[in-house]
Amino acid sequence: MRRIVAGLGALAVIAPALLAPVAAFAGPTCTTEAKDKWMSQDAMKAKVAEMGYQKIKTFKVSGSCYEIYGYTKDNKKAEVYFNPVTGAVVKSEID
């Protein structure tokens, strides 16, 4: 019986360490507003184009964000998260 208890104790120590990397891959929190307050996807796509992003390969809802994969006006790869209410950039990764 001791081995089972010791095994469960070890699991309690290891489990949080295994789950921590999952949180690292989660996207940012862009808004807490309800979706009926969000800009339409068409309006956001227009704003993204006005900001100079082009060749958008992916435009999607990601958690509480609009997320794009495309290119900057300087032709650099971009992954960008936007606040869907204001259109502001919340997080960007430019290569």
Q: Each PLM stretch: what is its role?
A:
Residues K73-N75:
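Glycine-centered tight beta-turn/hairpin loop motif at sheet-sheet or coil-to-beta transitions
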Residues A26-T32:
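Acidic/histidine-rich, surface-exposed loop or edge segments in extracytoplasmic proteins
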Residues I94-D95:
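Short, solvent-exposed mixed-charge patches
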Residues M1-F25:
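Classic N-terminal secretory signal peptides
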Residues V61-Y69:
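Surface-exposed aromatic
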Residues T32-K55:
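Short, non-transmembrane alpha-helical segments in secretory-pathway proteins
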Residues A78-V90:
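A short, surface-exposed beta-strand/turn
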Residues V48, I68-Y69, G87:
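Conserved histidines in hydrophobic membrane contexts and catalytic metal-binding motifs
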